[in-house]
Amino acid sequence: MKEREKFGSRLGFILVSAGCAIGIGNVWKFPYITGIYGGAAFILMYLVFLVALGLPIMVCEFTVGRGSRMGMGKALDTLEPKGTKWHRMKWISIFGSFLLMMFYTMVGGWMLKYAFMEATGTFVGLDGKAVEGVFGDMLTNPGTLTFWAIVAIVISFGACGFGLEKGIEKVTKVMMIALLLLMIALAVNSAFLPNAAAGIKFYLVPDFGEVAKKGFGNAVFAAMSQAFFTLSIGIGSMEIFGSYLDRKKRITGEAVNIVLLDTFVALMAGFIIIPVCFAYGVEPGSGPSLLFITLPTLFNNMAGGRIWGTLFFIFMSFAALSTIIAVFEEILAFFMDIGGWGRKKAVGVNFVLITVLSLPAILGFNVLSGIQPLGEGSNIMDMEDFLVSSNLLPLGSLVFVLFCVRKNGWGFENFLKEANEGEGIKFPHWIRLYMQYILPLIVVIIYLKGYYDMFSGKSTAMFVSWMCFAVLLLFVIFGVSIFTGRKKTGKVK
């Protein structure tokens, strides 16, 4: 059997894994949600949930990878006790990875397109209405969207094609270091804009009055959800890099480093965006309109705005591409582990698959805009995003946690032994009851709340049918967890 690839350095593992976690959500959502929920008051709650929720699930995912030395194609098969059906849950992983890439590659293409347009001066002299028109024209042109999505796909599969150490690790190291340097430069520039101090105050000074106004429960749930979704946990994109990790370091310490990097990027994004909005009297928003309409308009009004706009979208391109590369590797490993394929064959086949599968999201903004699967105003990308973010990420996370703690899964003792192999921060034994009961409950609450938020404003029939579907999926997960196989702790193989 061919020897498993390994990272060339510890830094490579940390930067590649952090690159997977760091995505566009760090930029187009975190600063806005921090500001409206009381600044530093929200950040404090967010950090608590990162440690209590995101970190242990990430440790579970990495540990399954390192313990099995396999991607999700065979990881659960390798570690599960005989007679159990945990391995069937691997399809959550591969389905989630493909579904995510069906729209994320398109959004990555948007970033590359905007970096190109900023660099070539497309936005120079345009007002907000004209910039909005540029974005609208891009969305209505399927040829443009397809071309830039393919550029993102080619770059990402190109990195994966050279293997772990010579391709993914080398390329992602360069991108992540450049990303961090670009962020610092952009944040320093924002800090010296007029009225920047007011923006920083809005962003960071604790405002418990805003928390009370928005509702403490709403603020807590917003912090909980952001902490959960920011780390890209649940579909195996972290697990695959755990399978390439040696046993010199304990996994908890490595996961802490990745969480810290992700948090740093999220916080720095606020230092870039919020002062810019305050400097030009614009309400800080979130989502695509912030990135593709508001910010290009503001860069036009800024001294050296064309340069800063170009640097910003290069930074955003790196954030998107680092995630795409990581998820592509998880997809490739699935085919290599399951089918025994070589890397080149896996790259070739999946290049075609991803390119074709990205077309519905692209056409959903133009040719197929009449298809509105989640109600009026929605599009195909919204549906794909909902299936990933509100379904497969929480359900996949639930599988990882239950598999690691239940006796008819891998078992907590086996999980703990593998997680604590090496030097560094130990994963505590006393956390067992929390992992078995409270953590799964929190994930279930996040999962069901996502459905409630999506469909509570729809018709009663739509709301009831989708909520029943959500509960049915939970029964499937817990059915495998509780009733599958013999009650015998799995062994590390």
Show the residue positions of the predicted features.
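Membrane-interface "cap" regions at the ends of multi-pass membrane proteins
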Residues: 1-28, 57-62, 66-91, 246-250, ...
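Loop-to-transmembrane helix boundary motifs in multi-pass membrane proteins
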Residues: 6, 12-14, 20, 142, ...
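Select transmembrane alpha-helical segments in multipass membrane proteins
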Residues: 6-17, 42-45, 85-98, 146-152, ...
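Transmembrane helix-boundary motif of multi-pass solute transporters/channels
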Residues: 11-49, 236-242, 252-256, 260-261, ...
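Membrane-water interface regions at transmembrane-helix termini and the short interhelical loops
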Residues: 33-37, 85-101, 136-140, 150-175, ...
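Inter-helical loop and helix-membrane interface segments of multi-pass membrane transporters/permeases
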Residues: 3-5, 33-37, 67-92, 105-165, ...
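C-terminal membrane-solvent junction of multi-pass transporters and transport-like membrane proteins
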Residues: 89-92, 96, 340-351, 387-447, ...
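Membrane-embedded translocation segments of transport machinery
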Residues: 2-7, 169, 173-321, 325-326, ...
